Amino acid sequence: FFDLIVADVPCSGEGMFRKDEQAVRDWSLQNVELCWKRQRDILESVWPALKPGGLLVYSTCTFNHFEDEDNVQWIAEHLGAEVLTVPVEPDWKIFGQYHFLPGYVCGEGQFMAVLRKNGTPSGHTVRSEKGKPAKSEPLALRQWVEGDFHFFLHKDAYHAVPAEYASQVAMLRSCLNVLVAGVQLAVPKGRDWQPAHSL
């Protein structure tokens, strides 16, 4: 769905050591392991939302290879991506897959890599949603809203989104856990409708 995702992920914070003594006290090999595993969980969660051929900018404020180069290699091999090189001037003093090291650049330090998701951009096929099949929209609810709206059933409640955004909402709901989309209208109660608070 997205052409570009920037994932500035939570990390062990080695780039914060000079200005935050608590970051030094909190650092441990166990915390580094916790961080690189959490980072992979985050990346796996956002990856389906990146279009084939789309770009991922992956960044941390730490320097160890577990959270930096190893995760970039994991993205390339496990999720399917090409690591891109960004031409930079030698006097910028940026190393490897773009380590911005304190003492060489302004700031406390950072790591960055750019990857292109495998595949060629194409139309997205919307997967059918899990749960109850959509019922035909109740005509009574059409009288509750003005304008051109698309109605859909989600968690036993009818929702409405502007018709011009219906395909985008359906696409997002097919690959992400969308908590809220549009306006919840009502929940069926027998032959009646219980209006939602969002109205």
Identify the meaning behind each predicted range.
Residues F1-V6:
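A short acidic, Gly/Pro-enriched loop at the edge of an enzyme's catalytic core
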Residues V83-G109:
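Class I S-adenosyl-L-methionine
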Residues E108-F111, N118-L199:
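Polybasic, low-complexity RNA-engagement segments
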Residues A7-E44, C61-D68:
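Mobile active-site "lid"/loop adjacent to the S-adenosyl-L-methionine
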Residues L50-P52:
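Helix-to-beta-strand junctions that scaffold the AdoMet/dcAdoMet cofactor pocket
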Residues G13-M16, N64-D68, D91, G107-G109, ...:
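Flexible loop/turn segments at secondary-structure boundaries
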Residues L56-V57:
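A short hydrophobic/small-residue beta-strand
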Residues Q30, E69-E89:
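Conserved Class I S-adenosyl-L-methionine
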